[in-house]
Amino acid sequence: MATIFSGGSVSPFLFHTNKGTSFTPKAPILHLKRSFSAKSVASVGTEPSLSPAVQTFWKWLQEEGVITAKTPVKASVVTEGLGLVALKDISRNDVILQVPKRLWINPDAVAASEIGRVCSELKPWLSVILFLIRERSREDSVWKHYFGILPQETDSTIYWSEEELQELQGSQLLKTTVSVKEYVKNECLKLEQEIILPNKRLFPDPVTLDDFFWAFGILRSRAFSRLRNENLVVVPMADLINHSAGVTTEDHAYEVKGAAGLFSWDYLFSLKSPLSVKAGEQVYIQYDLNKSNAELALDYGFIEPNENRHAYTLTLEISESDPFFDDKLDVAESNGFAQTAYFDIFYNRTLPPGLLPYLRLVALGGTDAFLLESLFRDTIWGHLELSVSRDNEELLCKAVREACKSALAGYHTTIEQDRELKEGNLDSRLAIAVGIREGEKMVLQQIDGIFEQKELELDQLEYYQERRLKDLGLCGENGDILGDLGKFF
């Protein structure tokens, strides 16, 4: 990690991928459920090749009134494992399933349960984790048959072995995975001491770390956060509809009021097909348009071949040893940033807004420090949007390029080697690792190329002093000095 910038040790790139430690699930981690109904499990859309657990689960949904004769999809074995396949032609925005709120797993369900009292002060995601663990152990749980179809683990990197994680050597995803696992472990150990042990009768014995990671993985991969007034909800059957990069909208899940049984009304989780689908084809949704491949790997255990999903996070920091620390921090905070700022850079996209101004702020020093005076406080960010001085611009370019080269040196393979490996028959986890390595390096090379080009243009850039002189009418369009400047300095 290079020490850069005048006035202190600033490490702009900590190779950090997740922003903070609030692991309330991100956007819709979806897969949804279907509804059918008929006289037998086979007649409501299941197939003989489905496991007994899935068939039992389907029958339970039928008994709960979730599956009706009108349900246009069936559970089927597909390339991804299980999925939803159309029983008939489905038009775009057709409703394919509805699930009543009484079957949702969310903080309200926790609050209404026997453990609600002891979980009332917990972060919502932690209370739901405890609820999942407890309900899975109960023979009389409403969700017994739902838990029967859930996997013990997925290909999410939180479940990888040490040997498998070594394939991510040098990557941000490896560091993020280790950080997430350590964070979850610490939170769950606190839960054990503060909630489980003082209330042993409410929880299974023992509750292991594996139980915590199972529940965390279920929540991370299945929690849906885009319903009205619902930030954390798991909907049974939400893990059967699969993701497709071909779906480019996320507007497919709704909370509606409707019939939830023969004589009852309730809020319903309603899922619409985002695309027109022919009978026999699989129905897909888009899990999240904004997630990088690293986030997809961490949350769901897969990546897309789409290069635009490749990303790298630059972490910039104002060093406390910087002689202008207080002023720089004030400027950063006044413009929506903090002492540490994270910038996600995606392949084939422009640099994110705020990155260059923040870099220039961190690098600011020497004769450029006058911009930190209170006189400029309301206008400094506008000045930082443009090049300040040659020294400042050269310093930030050098810092970024050195950080990129340092990061690239941390991988144990080259892009060419990764691409050669991809031609082989890789298992799912190795394929993820190779794809992540390749993608991160592609973005790092892109960043390095951007700032290499900026270095080549340093002599052609217009800097603050030249712009100021032009504003005063003392500098021509070609940069020629006009008149006697002595009286202005």
From Swiss-Prot:
Protein's UniProt keywords contain S-adenosyl-L-methionine: yes
GO cellular component: chloroplast
A biological process from GO: methylation
Binding site for substrate: R222, R226, D239, Y254, Y287, Y300
EC class of the enzyme, as a word: transferase
Pfam families in the cross-refs: Rubis-subs-bind
Tissue specificity comment: Highly expressed in leaf.
S-adenosyl-L-methionine in keyword set: yes
Cross-referenced PROSITE patterns: SAM_MT127, SET
Residues of the transit peptide: 1-37
Domain of life, per lineage: Eukaryota
InterPro entries the UniProt entry points to: Rubisco_LSMT_MeTrfase_plant, Rubisco_LSMT_subst-bd, Rubisco_LSMT_subst-bd_sf, SET_dom, SET_dom_sf, SET_RBCMT, SETD3_SETD6_MTase
GO MF term set: [ribulose-bisphosphate carboxylase]-lysine N-methyltransferase activity; protein-lysine N-methyltransferase activity
Main location: plastid
Keywords of the record: Chloroplast, Methyltransferase, Plastid, S-adenosyl-L-methionine, Transferase, Transit peptide
Enzyme Commission number(s): 2.1.1.127, 2.1.1.259
CDD domains in the record: SET_RBCMT (cd19179)
Residues covered by the SET domain: 64-288
Catalytic reaction equation(s): L-lysyl-[ribulose-1,5-bisphosphate carboxylase] + 3 S-adenosyl-L-methionine = N(6),N(6),N(6)-trimethyl-L-lysyl-[ribulose-1,5-bisphosphate carboxylase] + 3 S-adenosyl-L-homocysteine + 3 H(+); [fructose-bisphosphate aldolase]-L-lysine + 3 S-adenosyl-L-methionine = [fructose-bisphosphate aldolase]-N(6),N(6),N(6)-trimethyl-L-lysine + 3 S-adenosyl-L-homocysteine + 3 H(+)
Residues involved in S-adenosyl-L-methionine binding: E80, G81, L82, R222, N242, H243
Compartments (UniProt record): Plastid, Chloroplast
Family under the similarity heading: Belongs to the class V-like SAM-binding methyltransferase superfamily. Plant protein-lysine LSMT methyltransferase family.
Subunit structure: Homotrimer.
Biological role stated in the UniProt entry: Methylates 'Lys-14' of the large subunit of RuBisCO. Can also use with lower efficiency chloroplastic fructose-bisphosphate aldolases and gamma-tocopherol methyltransferase as substrates, but not a cytosolic aldolase.
Annotated protein name in UniProt: Ribulose-1,5 bisphosphate carboxylase/oxygenase large subunit N-methyltransferase, chloroplastic
Lineage, broadest ranks: Eukaryota, Viridiplantae, Streptophyta, Embryophyta, Tracheophyta
Gene name of this polypeptide: RBCMT
